[in-house]
């Protein structure tokens, strides 16, 4: 489900990837959390790639629309 949502936000003409950020669990970072703009990620099989950082899907905490502040996805 999460992979499909990210693909939709990246490729569907109704959405602009520049409007979204992904907040993910990153041990050792402030509050153990980092953010990456959706437009800068590449989807692999079971993880996202940002620069040379691999982010497993299970570490994604939320996806936020930066224009509206709406949380599109939030991990339970």
UniProtKB/Swiss-Prot annotation:
NCBIfam families tied to this protein: PRK04257.1
Family membership noted in the UniProt record: Belongs to the UPF0248 family.
Annotated transmembrane regions: none
HAMAP family linked: UPF0248 (MF_01245)
Protein name: UPF0248 protein MMP0286
Source superkingdom: Archaea
Provenance organism: Methanococcus maripaludis (strain DSM 14266 / JCM 13030 / NBRC 101832 / S2 / LL)
Pfam families membership: MJ1316 (PF04457)
InterPro entries reported for this sequence: MJ1316, UPF0248
């Amino acid at each position: 489900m999460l992979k499909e949502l990210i693909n939709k936000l990246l490729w569907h003409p109704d959405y602009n990837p520049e409007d979204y950020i992904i907040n993910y669990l990153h041990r050792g970072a402030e509050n153990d959390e980092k953010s990456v703009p959706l437009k800068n990620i590449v989807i692999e099989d079971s993880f996202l790639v940002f620069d040379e950082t691999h982010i497993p899907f299970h570490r994604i905490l939320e996806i936020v629309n930066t224009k509206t502040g709406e949380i599109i996805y939030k991990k339970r």
